[in-house]
């Protein structure tokens, strides 16, 4: 896989019209920082007389370029000055036009620059490596793998792209050992299974040792309803009928995976690795709350009711409700559809749209400021009769009488006679009064506010605001009803329609409405509802990880991981394919599948295919009934080992790395 760069394209275009070619340095040459180095090139007669010399590096990040000097091209050699240069790989010499540096005449191969402290370079045979894999299934359940590879420096963070570049002296050899451990707690639900996995690496070279490790702990909470989760349960003993009820909330934690090592120096070409993980977690569940306290309504809920009032249940946000209360204090706020019945002793009036504002203790009174009537008023010593046309008529009877005719009804009468005041201007009315009773009937629209002692009343759009302690009180901010009010000495009945909402609280309850709401506090005193959750919540995760890496532009390793987790089992499948620069030439394919069930049993299968050999292995074990599944394994014992002969070429080390990466997940199984 050859890197395509803008400079490379310009070189190709320049070579069409010029024959200049750089011979020294060549590919894989090694220069030393702070030393004089030779430059050699060849020209043809059509080449320019002069050129600028640049030192560039497009492999390292960020790319660099540095002007060095101007040369006479037909000299065909020059001396590169002793400069302080950063050690690394990917350097090139570039000859450009003295008038326009974007015009490139020639460019050298890629070479190395090492530090000037005297690091030696030892030439020898081509680097060879041997990879050995040994797997055994015994009571301890352990697997290990080791290999010799070029030293590298890699830093990994979750969902990131990994780049590393390092150089060191020949010969180079790195020992890598990998150890993993896992402990899985399996108990009878609840709670769900939780697990802790750890992974560590130790990398030692002749120059710099390094090590890294990470630990991941996962768990699941007991519940996950549609939108609410209990925050505390005071006493689980009082909720013995529940099917799955925790005494505390279990949280799930996860530590990001981080693998790091010290910076190393080696001649190993750059590696580039990309790891991408995608997936989703789904948790389902439902809960039902049943209780034996306090209310029954549709969409408006009392805020306070004593324990003697009916129970409240709700499974919808739109319904019709009847609320009944006796000798209690009920506060009603909100708008909504509903009806209610109030009982008091004694009440006084019946009307449609206008209600008396003041009544003596023994005689009803009625006041009105209405000024629009056509009236005839007749008075004698014993009676007053009022009749009219237009907006209303009325008859008054009293002893003795008081008035003459006018268009406004009297606003003041002695205590033994009714009084009438009204702010309503539109109704048809007949009014009859005696020393003890005022009866008013009529139709129309209006509004009024009244306070009386000892009774209270309701009308079409305004509800009483105050009542004595022995009688229910009712307040409302609702202003839209259609109402019929009837009163006798003992009963006031109010019915109406509208819309509204409210919030209910009480001294020892909890409630449910709309869809699924789980109580946040349960009191152990009094009559407490039970809590049940059914079915038990389940969590599952499915996703795919893709890991690809390349080295030395000759090999490519691709790892695909597919995994699915649920309370029943966890299955992970990893397939790693290593290819040369030609995709049709597959160096190796390794597939690993591992499954761990809820009961503690596990199995794994590995199939590795190489041009000359194939390895297949299947292992399984079943835990005992103890809490820790890692404490017991099958008594059977099986082991397999494989040694791969070294192969020529720089792809050998990557091939071994790929094999090691594939076998690592097997260690988590045991």
From Swiss-Prot:
- Give the signal peptide, or none: 1-19
Q: Does the keyword Secreted apply?
A: yes
Q: Which GO terms describe its cellular component?
A: cell surface; endoplasmic reticulum; extracellular region
Q: Give the UniProt subcellular location, in the record's own words.
A: Secreted; Endoplasmic reticulum
Q: Which InterPro entries match?
A: GPI-anchor_Adhesion_Reg
User: Which residues lie within the region annotated Disordered?
Assistant: 526-651
**Which residues carry attached sugars according to the database record?**
77, 159, 204, 224, 274, 297, 327, 351, 370, 381, 405, 424, 435, 459, 478, 489, 513
Q: Which UniProt keywords apply?
A: Endoplasmic reticulum, Glycoprotein, Secreted, Signal
The entry's protein name is: Serine/threonine-rich protein adg2
Q: Which gene encodes it?
A: adg2
